[in-house]
């Protein structure tokens, strides 16, 4: 009985992050994340602070929680804090909400729990889904969230893909493998983390890893206890 209980507990503990990651719905490519990979989480934290925190807050996440992913207080203060000198403060956006509404037409949402509400696969697909669309106010659109107000802040890393336009300057659509109408895209230029092969194929492995690290951190941020839970799960398995 005790052995069965341990096995059941371990299975539930290990399955919880996977179930959370699948909650986003939609036909998105699955992304494998490892909340125990501290190097990945640290890279993701750096990407988040340098790019996302300009406009988005993470008001339920305090800077000192980053110690949980292996960073020291000095590393946090010297590399990840730009708007406060108190390590116990929460992650607030650099941009004033009123300015954000004026420039983007809406206040960018808080990202603390976005991975839990939308799912890891959704976030990973969103980070890879930006494309140039001259019909949009910001000049950008997204395959995962059509008519998104957000510009592509990671375009320098990913490069630029653009929607094909018809004779009237309107986006060309096509059906995907699931029969859904999607924009017909083509790559225009590579970025710092992408390249074209000699045969013209677009290689984005490094950018995909970059997006995976950011997704991993956002998944951790939505549920910091998942690292401990997964460790407990493996310990329980080892004693069965």
Show which residues each predicted segment covers.
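Conserved small/polar residues in nucleotide/adenosyl-binding loops
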Residues: 240
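Electron-transfer interface patches adjacent to heme c in soluble/periplasmic c-type cytochromes
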Residues: 71-143, 148-176, 189-207
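Short, aromatic-rich amphipathic segments at membrane interfaces
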Residues: 198-236
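Bacterial N-terminal signal peptides that target proteins for export
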Residues: 1-10
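The canonical Cys-X-X-Cys-His
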Residues: 48-59, 214
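Extracytoplasmic/secreted proteins, especially bacterial periplasmic and envelope-associated proteins
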Residues: 39, 43, 47, 118, ...
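Electrostatic cytochrome c docking/interface patches
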Residues: 21-46, 57-68, 76, 222-230
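N-terminal signal peptide c-region/cleavage motif recognized by signal peptidases
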Residues: 15-17
């Amino acid at each position: 009985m005790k052995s069965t209980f341990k096995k059941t507990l371990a299975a539930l503990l290990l399955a919880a992050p996977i179930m959370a990651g699948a909650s986003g719905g939609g036909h998105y490519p699955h992304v494998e994340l490892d909340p125990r990979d501290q190097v990945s989480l640290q890279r993701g934290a750096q990407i988040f602070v340098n790019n996302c925190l300009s406009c988005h807050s993470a008001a339920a996440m305090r800077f000192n929680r980053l110690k949980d992913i292996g960073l020291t207080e000095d590393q946090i203060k010297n590399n990840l804090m730009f708007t406060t000198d108190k390590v116990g403060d929460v992650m607030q956006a650099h941009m004033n909400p009123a300015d954000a509404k004026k420039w983007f037409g809406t206040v960018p949402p808080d990202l603390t729990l976005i991975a839990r509400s939308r799912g890891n696969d959704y976030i990973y697909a969103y980070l890879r889904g930006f494309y140039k669309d001259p019909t949009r106010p910001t000049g950008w659109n997204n395959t995962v969230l059509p008519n998104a107000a957000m510009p592509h802040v990671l375009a320098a890393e990913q490069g630029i893909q653009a929607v094909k336009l018809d004779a009237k300057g309107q986006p060309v659509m096509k059906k995907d493998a699931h029969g859904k109408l999607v924009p017909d895209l083509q790559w225009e230029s590579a970025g710092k983390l992408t390249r074209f092969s000699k045969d013209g194929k677009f290689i984005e492995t490094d950018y995909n890893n970059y997006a995976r690290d950011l997704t991993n951190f956002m998944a951790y941020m939505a549920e910091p206890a998942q690292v401990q839970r997964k460790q407990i799960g493996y310990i329980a398995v080892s004693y069965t």
